[in-house]
């Protein structure tokens, strides 16, 4: 029995999709040989399931509820709750006689409102998560910037110390100097870890083990002579591994403890950190293990429901396996951390294309390095930008102020003294047109001689090392290691120039000098500039008009709305403040009460508006991933293929095609177990016919082999 006609309709509509017209085609209906064994009418005895709101999917938001207590969302909310509707689907909710112009206008308005609602929903869902607060909340973001500035100033001090000692004059950023480059990186790490001079000397005296050094030896000795030397080393290592497995761990530990390992660490990679888990909670767990140094956490990853990843760093002389097991034995927020041992970096010096040593390429790279240096000095607030406010520095960058001319970094002046005056001067577009060096000028030569200018490369190397040490920018990899000070390797690797280019198009002239195609050089410069621009320089800004469209909030209006929310009229000359529970004679008394007794709440409302506006102002703001649309199946009656065959998931059976809700493609509500997919059977269609939509084999051709050749 049902209480009303509406409930009866809802009950009948529950399995409406199982009684499609398509299910009754070809005389099969929704029945198959399994359905005949089930008593009819059994389905109607089941209790009707409670409806579920459309927005109660795998998002972070609760089910929308209307004012009458129903679980169904209101009409105004449901249109913005799910994914963005297509124009065709949007038109189904409009009047039939709507004009094309009005339809496009309303659809654009719908898209704007949908985007605004989605951003608001995302903000409410994630505003209490730590990674989101550190990124956009004014107070937390300020603390993070101050900590970053402190780390950069420490790195600048280390750079100046090594420069005064002449450490950067011992090598060039070429792959052949890999050993000296690794020594320099180790020196940086020791000083960042506040190591003493004795520890630094001990580290520099140790033998280096790196794959880049092995590659250099192979190039020097040849492939044939190096292989016999490697075999006994491998056997010795395998023997050492066997001893460790048999229980001789203490010997290895004693040997490693005699070395100075201040520049080396062990680390654990945490693959599964819930978004609600804080840094302090995870750090407290890691501190229970001996030798803990630091912890690094990433931002929430949209593709993983904003779970984070992390690296816990420990001293080198501890048993990292036991620590990893201990971390996996704990569950935080009912979640396994899935910790694994992080592998060491085995190749600390990596190569870029050797054409980077060519003079024309080096001049281009030098200009880019100068631009990056002054830009990141300005961003972080070094030298003359130290006394400027964050907003003023950002405005100068956005307005395109000449940062090179305004920079007081002494390194820029030193670089200018190392190269000719005209090398760093960019000519204007008008001057380029007059000189004929623009696109319309004389065509360049097909091939040019490979030329190397040591003075330009020396100036370039100084800037690249500065960027790598101070700002954690790997120039030749066009990458910024933003969290390097919290990572296991604080200055782990660097990319340098490789060997001179070789190939079919690279030839030599009569003097034996390399000759390279001009187009190859131009293409390399163009591609490198593009990657540097996109990866390190370019920043997208959101206009004020766009912010207003996305729902930018006014702090004072939010405060006023908070006051109005806490001003409730009970009767004539009787008003209530829900925040404190006190009653007043008029609304003006409540306003004074809130401004005097609850000023912190008003500041929270104002700060919440700034918090939300900071999120909107980020052009690369995180958003929820759009759900992937399932491929449409045009064969609705057959049920074969993906949507009607064996092995279909129960959730997938709700969609069109396949003829019903069971995994066999029949029309009944079947609770039989699902079988593994059997592609050879295709699927069992709604019409009860097997192999209907399965891929068909080529028909066999029957031919009389004894027939004459002229008869087909």
Curated annotation (Swiss-Prot):
The subcellular location is: Nucleus
Tell me which positions the record assigns to the signal sequence. Answer: none
Q: Where is the composition biased (Basic and acidic residues)?
A: 8-26, 34-54, 214-236, 621-637, 645-655
Q: Give me the stretches of Gly residues compositional bias.
A: 656-668
Residue ranges under compositional bias (Acidic residues)?
A: 240-251
InterPro entries associated with the record: SE/Ars2 (IPR039727), SERRATE/Ars2_C (IPR007042), SERRATE/Ars2_N (IPR021933)
One BP term from GO: primary miRNA processing
Segments traversing the membrane: none
In the record, the note on similarity to other proteins reads:
Belongs to the ARS2 family.
Per its record, how is this protein called by name?
A: Serrate RNA effector molecule homolog
Report the source organism. Answer: Caenorhabditis elegans
């Amino acid at each position: 029995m049902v209480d009303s006609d509406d409930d009866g309709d809802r009950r009948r509509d529950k399995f409406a999709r199982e009684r499609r017209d398509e299910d009754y085609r070809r005389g099969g209906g929704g029945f198959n040989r399994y359905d005949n064994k089930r008593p009819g009418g059994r389905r109607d005895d089941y209790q009707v399931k409670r409806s579920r709101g459309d927005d109660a999917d795998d998002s972070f938001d609760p089910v929308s509820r209307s004012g009458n207590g129903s679980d169904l969302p209101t009409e105004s909310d449901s249109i913005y709750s799910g994914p963005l509707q297509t124009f065709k689907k949007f038109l189904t909710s409009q009047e039939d006689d709507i004009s094309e112009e009005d339809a496009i206008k309303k659809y654009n308005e719908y898209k704007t409102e949908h985007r605004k609602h989605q951003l608001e929903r995302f903000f409410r869902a994630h505003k209490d998560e730590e990674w989101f607060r550190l990124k956009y909340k004014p107070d937390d973001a300020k603390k993070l910037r101050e900590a970053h500035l402190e780390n950069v100033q420490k790195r600048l001090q280390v750079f100046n110390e090594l420069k005064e000692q002449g450490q950067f004059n011992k090598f060039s950023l070429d792959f052949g100097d890999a050993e000296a480059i690794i020594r320099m990186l180790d020196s940086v790490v020791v000083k960042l870890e506040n190591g003493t001079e004795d520890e630094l000397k001990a580290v520099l005296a140790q033998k280096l083990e790196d794959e880049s050094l092995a590659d250099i030896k192979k190039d020097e000795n040849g492939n044939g002579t190096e292989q016999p030397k490697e075999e006994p080393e491998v056997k010795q290592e395998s023997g050492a591994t066997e001893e460790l497995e048999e229980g001789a761990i203490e010997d290895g530990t004693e040997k490693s403890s005699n070395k100075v390992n201040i520049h080396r660490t062990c680390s654990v990679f945490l693959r599964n950190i819930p978004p609600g888990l804080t840094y302090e909670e995870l750090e407290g767990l890691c501190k229970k293990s001996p030798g803990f140094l630091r912890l690094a956490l990433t931002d929430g990853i949209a593709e993983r429901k904003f779970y984070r990843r992390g690296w816990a760093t420990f001293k080198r002389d501890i048993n990292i396996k036991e620590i990893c097991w201990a971390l996996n034995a704990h569950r935080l927020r009912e979640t396994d951390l899935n910790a694994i041992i992080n592998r060491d970096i085995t190749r600390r010096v990596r190569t870029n294309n050797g054409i980077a040593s060519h003079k024309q390429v080096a001049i281009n790279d030098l200009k880019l390095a100068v631009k990056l240096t002054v830009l990141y000095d300005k961003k972080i607030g070094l030298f003359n930008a130290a006394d400027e406010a964050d907003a003023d520095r950002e405005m100068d960058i956005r307005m395109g102020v000449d940062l090179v001319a305004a920079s007081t970094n002494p390194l820029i002046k030193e670089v200018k003294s190392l190269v000719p005056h005209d090398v760093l001067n960019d000519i204007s577009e008008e001057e380029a047109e007059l000189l004929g060096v623009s696109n319309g000028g004389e065509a360049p030569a097909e091939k040019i001689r490979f030329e190397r200018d040591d003075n330009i490369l020396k100036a370039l190397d100084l800037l690249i090392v500065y960027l790598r040490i101070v700002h954690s920018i790997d120039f030749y990899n066009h990458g910024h290691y933003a969290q390097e000070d919290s990572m296991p390797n604080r200055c782990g690797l660097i990319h340098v120039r490789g060997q001179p280019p070789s190939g079919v198009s690279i030839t030599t002239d009569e003097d034996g000098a390399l000759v390279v195609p001009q187009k190859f050089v131009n293409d390399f410069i163009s591609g490198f500039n593009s990657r540097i621009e996109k990866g390190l320089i370019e920043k997208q800004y959101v206009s004020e008009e766009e912010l207003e469209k996305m729902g930018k909030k006014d702090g004072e209006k939010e405060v006023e709305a908070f006051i109005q929310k806490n001003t409730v009229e009970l009767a004539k000359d009787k008003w209530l403040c829900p925040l404190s529970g006190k009653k007043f004679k008029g609304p003006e008394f409540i306003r004074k009460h809130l401004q005097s007794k609850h000023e912190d709440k008003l500041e929270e409302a104002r700060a919440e508006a700034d918090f939300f506006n900071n999120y909107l102002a980020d052009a690369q703001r995180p958003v929820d991933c759009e759900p992937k649309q399932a491929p449409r199946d045009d064969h609705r009656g057959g049920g074969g293929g993906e949507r009607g065959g064996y092995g279909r998931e129960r959730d997938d059976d709700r969609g069109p095609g396949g003829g019903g809700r069971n995994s066999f493609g029949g029309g009944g509500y079947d609770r039989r177990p699902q079988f593994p997919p059997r592609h050879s059977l295709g699927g069992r269609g709604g019409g009860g016919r097997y192999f209907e939509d399965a891929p068909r084999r080529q028909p066999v051709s029957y031919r009389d082999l004894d027939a004459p050749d002229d008869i087909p």
